[in-house]
């Protein structure tokens, strides 16, 4: 029986490639005729441009979130190295006590320190796994945000053509409205697919976060303060 590959194990770049073939170059409308439109006739174009600006702002935020996720993962990898060093030190100290025929009370404390160090390693591993998934989520969110910008560009061109045609501007006659409408539809479909992929990845990250928290609660009293806060995988809302 063929095993299915979990979605979270697929790099975000591969997920993006699986979604159609990427954005096509935006179709441009000869908008020289827009100068003939009055304020009311230009309103749909202005509205589309405002939405495009919001999409571009959302893409900037998504890129910043991706950088934050990468930074948290880098810190987590360092914490794992520290936890490994602590375990090695605890094991060495316990071995030394055994060679010195130390008192049972000292050996018991050494055993407890070894177990605590092992718990810290398990917690560090689960934290790293969670943050690796959150990097994938951030990459998927960035891909979806970029697709939203592509959709916004297509809608701006569509609004220009419709506004000029409604005003009987000659420049509108040379444009292919069918191609522009098709470009909008393709952009919207691709954006929806990328948003679904991001949501699926986030669902996997929630499970990883919960597992990490269950282990981390046992070692939290021994752990040092977090050098960088690690938030839960809250769902991001699509830009409006």
Give a label for each model feature.
Residues 15-37:
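Bacterial Sec signal peptide processing site at the extreme N-terminus
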């Amino acid at each position: 029986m063929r095993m299915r590959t979990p979605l979270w194990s697929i790099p975000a770049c591969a997920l993006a490639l699986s979604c159609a073939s990427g954005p096509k170059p935006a179709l441009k409308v000869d908008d020289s005729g827009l100068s003939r439109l009055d304020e009311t006739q230009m309103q749909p174009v202005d509205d589309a441009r405002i939405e495009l600006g919001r999409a571009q702002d959302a893409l900037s935020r998504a890129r910043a979130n991706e950088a934050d996720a990468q930074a948290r993962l880098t810190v987590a990898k360092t914490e794992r190295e520290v936890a490994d060093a602590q375990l090695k030190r605890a094991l060495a100290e316990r071995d030394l006590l055994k060679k010195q025929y130390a008192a049972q009370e000292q050996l018991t404390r050494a055993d407890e320190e070894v177990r605590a160090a092992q718990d810290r390693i398990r917690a560090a591993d689960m934290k790293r796994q969670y943050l690796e998934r959150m990097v994938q989520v951030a990459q998927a969110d960035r891909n979806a945000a970029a697709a939203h910008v592509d959709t916004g560009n297509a809608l701006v061109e569509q609004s220009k053509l419709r506004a000029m045609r409604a005003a009987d501007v000659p420049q509108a006659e040379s444009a292919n409205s069918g191609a522009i409408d098709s470009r909008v539809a393709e952009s919207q479909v691709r954006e929806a697919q990328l948003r679904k992929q991001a949501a699926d990845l986030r669902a996997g990250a929630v499970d990883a976060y919960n597992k990490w928290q269950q282990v981390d609660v046992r070692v939290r009293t021994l752990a040092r303060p977090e050098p960088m806060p690690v938030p839960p995988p809250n769902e991001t809302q699509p830009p409006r």
